[in-house]
Amino acid sequence: MKLFVFLALAVAAATAVPAPAQKLTPTPIKDIQGRITNGYPAYEGKVPYIVGLLFSGNGNWWCGGSIIGNTWVLTAAHCTNGASGVTINYGASIRTQPQYTHWVGSGDIIQHHHYNSGNLHNDISLIRTPHVDFWSLVNKVELPSYNDRYQDYAGWWAVASGWGGTYDGSPLPDWLQSVDVQIISQSDCSRTWSLHDNMICINTDGGKSTCGGDSGGPLVTHDGNRLVGVTSFGSAAGCQSGAPAVFSRVTGYLDWIRDNTGISY
């Protein structure tokens, strides 16, 4: 059922003259599978804040998102870009069996006003939803507090989740997958990517990665269970290529989220 947005990379052509390594620049391409690789099946209720998003517009495409309030979902701007509406799937462990769904139109999608589809700066969007009651299978994830807005989270462990394939070329799994990953510093990630300050990266050593994962989906810290990343892009070379996977850094958007939703910690 699910084909998740994945992002390919434009890589500079090699020349015969030795030169410093050139950083990679992301280029979004829709309708390519994202993947959770070398993860594990998430037990029912482990990730009650994740939603599956089926967008409609010029075609249909799938992304992930995170419940941050009774009437709000956070996702990626490259997911909402060009959408005329979205069906939100709540409480699914088996990807084809959500507890319930809601549909909302483009008027309830708030895409970051400075989103740049060329370099994926400000790759973040909000979706205003009908009110949902929280219970064991459908619940919110908390944002970082304002006291942590300058925290870089380097060295912290986090969990990413989604319904993407479990290895390069694999079919989509029926069951929600999670993977435990370590956040790396901006300086380490900048060796591979041309980064914006409001991006955050994970180490993919050992083939553990979202590799783009469910674009728009969550990266949540083990310590404190705070949503610190929104899945943005990964390497087109494959999920086990070793390149860091990149997320929008939620702490960089706390003011924007508060101004649009009233949610803050």
Swiss-Prot record:
Domain annotation Peptidase S1: ranges: 36-262
Signal sequence residues: 1-21
Keyword Hydrolase belongs to the record: yes
Keywords for the protein's UniProt record, in alphabetical order: Disulfide bond, Hydrolase, Protease, Serine protease, Signal, Zymogen
Intrachain S-S bonds: C63-C79, C189-C201, C211-C239
Protein family: Belongs to the peptidase S1 family.
Function noted in UniProt: Major function may be to aid in digestion.
Protein name in UniProt: Serine protease 1
Species of the source: Drosophila melanogaster
Originating gene: Jon99Cii
